[in-house]
């Protein structure tokens, strides 16, 4: 039995293309892998606090007493990291906003990236500590950016996930959604076909 963690990060709730596709992924996965456990965390519905000058102090080793906000941030960071490490497959619904990921997803990454916990520095360079995972990124875009200089989502997510130890990453693209109903429908159809292929593998 595998454990699947689905991270939603769109601010558009049910209207969101990436949310719809991640819901489709869950439906297909449950159909093919009925014994698996699926956890869904909506980072827009339940937002992660923004990392600021106060909160960053909670995530670094120190003997200084923590404020209430810092204690809450550290507890949430511990919870998010434990959840991430406890799952085998990580599904990230990542819409493109202004060429990059949403603030909601970035805030999550800022609490998950902790030296000595999810990565460490060695004589040979940084080493990721979140290993043995597979990641599937479902990314929706209004325009067409794949393989172009305006796609900052793909290299950023590949780099971040690899940095914490997740190197088996597959991307599902839904592009051109803002080009009209016909293009949006094709983007959804193509993305669902890619999801079907991943689920069946």
Curated annotation (Swiss-Prot):
The gene is azoR. Its cofactor is FMN. Signal peptide: none annotated. Binds 1 FMN per subunit. HAMAP family: Azoreductase_type1. This is FMN-dependent NADH:quinone oxidoreductase. One of its GO terms (molecular function) is oxidoreductase activity, acting on NAD(P)H as acceptor. Homodimer. Quinone reductase that provides resistance to thiol-specific stress caused by electrophilic quinones. Also exhibits azoreductase activity. Catalyzes the reductive cleavage of the azo bond in aromatic azo compounds to the corresponding amines. It catalyses: 2 a quinone + NADH + H(+) = 2 a 1,4-benzosemiquinone + NAD(+); N,N-dimethyl-1,4-phenylenediamine + anthranilate + 2 NAD(+) = 2-(4-dimethylaminophenyl)diazenylbenzoate + 2 NADH + 2 H(+). Its EC number is 1.6.5.-, 1.7.1.17. FMN binds at residues 10, 16-18, 96-99, 140-143. Keywords: Flavoprotein, FMN, NAD, Oxidoreductase. The lineage of its organism: Bacteria, Pseudomonadati, Pseudomonadota, Gammaproteobacteria, Enterobacterales. It is an enzyme of class 1 (oxidoreductase). Belongs to the azoreductase type 1 family.
């Amino acid at each position: 039995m595998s454990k699947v963690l689905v991270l939603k990060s769109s601010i558009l709730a049910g209207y969101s293309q990436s949310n719809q596709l991640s819901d489709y992924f869950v439906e297909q996965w449950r159909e093919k892998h009925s014994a698996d456990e699926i956890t869904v965390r909506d980072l827009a519905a339940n937002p992660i606090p923004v990392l600021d000058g106060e909160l960053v102090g909670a995530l670094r080793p120190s003997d200084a007493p923590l404020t209430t906000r810092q204690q809450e941030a550290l507890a949430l960071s511990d919870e998010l990291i434990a959840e991430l490490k406890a799952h085998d497959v990580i599904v990230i619904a990542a819409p493109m906003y202004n060429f990059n990921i949403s603030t909601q997803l970035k805030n999550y990454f800022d609490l998950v990236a902790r030296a000595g916990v999810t990565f460490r520095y060695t004589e040979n360079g940084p080493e990721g500590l979140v290993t043995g995972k597979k990641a599937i990124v479902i990314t929706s875009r209004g325009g067409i950016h794949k393989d172009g200089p305006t796609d900052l989502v793909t290299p950023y997510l590949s780099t971040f996930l690899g940095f914490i130890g997740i190197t088996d990453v597959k991307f599902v693209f839904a592009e051109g959604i803002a080009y009209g109903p016909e293009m949006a429908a094709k983007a959804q159809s193509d993305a669902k076909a890619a999801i079907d292929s991943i689920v069946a593998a």
